[in-house]
């Protein structure tokens, strides 16, 4: 066997082995997407309705509550960026991190300092490599988050939000500086093909006209009675609201991660098929050239023997 043919066949074996890995990862991601979609569908209504409930309570409450009352001159904001723990998911993590950088740049342009809270090793490694400050980080569950994970993240964010600016709160994760706003950056799962990075403000809650004026269409404004008080109701809703928003964002990001990884692995598998076909053609051409050379050598040797025999006679 010629040296060139051996090289081609060695490369084919290597590509085939890689194809088996990418194909297996594609199938695993495809099987996990279904469950991830179901979890997103199950959590979204609760998160949406809780947000509407908070908006309704805040709209008809005369109390100034941190949940809905914006600081006149905000000086620091917390930004939660949700990425992946593992790679091989295309541009999924990079897109979320880039969206976070755009949000941070916009906040800094408004004169607002930022505290970065990160979920996923990709974001953590990105920040550490660039020597950026990290207020809090969580890893190891990006592709399968639970409500307990979301609650842990939400508690850190709430602690920072309820701490006055300039003060520091001591937690298990370390010292947290007080912030005036909470923002979250995650990847919204729209379909198997489309997943978009999204930046949204969680606190103070931005009341939309559709939320505040749901009753306007009927011409009647609802009357609310708060027991024991509107402030205590909002205090009770605050952690639930943040936990629900964070959990839903984590689930959306997990589903997006699986979809992105499946798409990336399918592309890698297809590329491996094309490369195998190309190497097969090159190997066949090399084999044909080798056979042609062997035939030429045999014919040449036969002619030489025939000429030698004729000369001896």
Language-model regions, residue ranges each:
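C-terminal beta-strand-loop-alpha-helix "lid" module of Rossmann-like NAD(P)-dependent dehydrogenases
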Residues: 1-313
């Amino acid at each position: 066997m010629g040296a060139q043919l051996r090289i081609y066949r060695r490369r084919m074996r290597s590509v085939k082995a890689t194809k088996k890995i990418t194909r297996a990862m594609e199938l695993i991601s495809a099987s996990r997407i279904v469950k991830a979609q179901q979890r997103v569908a199950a959590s979204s209504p609760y998160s949406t309705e809780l947000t509407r409930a908070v908006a309704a309570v805040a709209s008809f409450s005369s109390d100034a509550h941190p949940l809905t009352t914006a600081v006149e001159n905000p000086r620091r904001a917390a930004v939660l960026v949700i990425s992946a723990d593992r790679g091989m998911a295309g541009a999924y993590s990079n897109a979320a991190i880039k969206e976070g950088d755009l949000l941070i740049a916009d906040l800094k342009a408004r004169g607002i300092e930022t505290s970065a809270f990160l979920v996923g090793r990709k974001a953590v490694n990105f920040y550490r490599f660039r020597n950026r400050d990290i207020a809090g980080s969580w890893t190891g569950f990006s592709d399968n988050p639970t409500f307990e994970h979301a609650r842990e993240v939400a508690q850190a964010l709430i602690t920072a939000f309820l701490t006055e600016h300039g003060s520091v709160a001591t937690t298990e994760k370390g010292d947290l500086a007080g912030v005036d706003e909470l923002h979250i950056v995650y990847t919204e799962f729209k379909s198997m093909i489309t997943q978009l990075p999204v930046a949204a403000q969680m606190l103070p809650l931005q009341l939309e006209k559709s939320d505040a004026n749901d009753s306007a269409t009927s011409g009647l404004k609802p009357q609310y009675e708060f027991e024991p008080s509107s402030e205590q109701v909002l205090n009770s809703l605050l952690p639930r609201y943040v936990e629900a928003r964070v959990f839903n964002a984590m689930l959306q990001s997990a589903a997006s991660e699986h979809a992105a990884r499946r798409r990336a692995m399918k592309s890698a598998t297809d590329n491996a098929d094309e490369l195998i076909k190309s190497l097969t053609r090159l190997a066949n051409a090399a084999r044909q050239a080798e056979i042609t050379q062997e035939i030429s050598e045999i014919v040449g040797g036969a002619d030489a023997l025939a000429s030698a025999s004729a000369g001896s006679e």
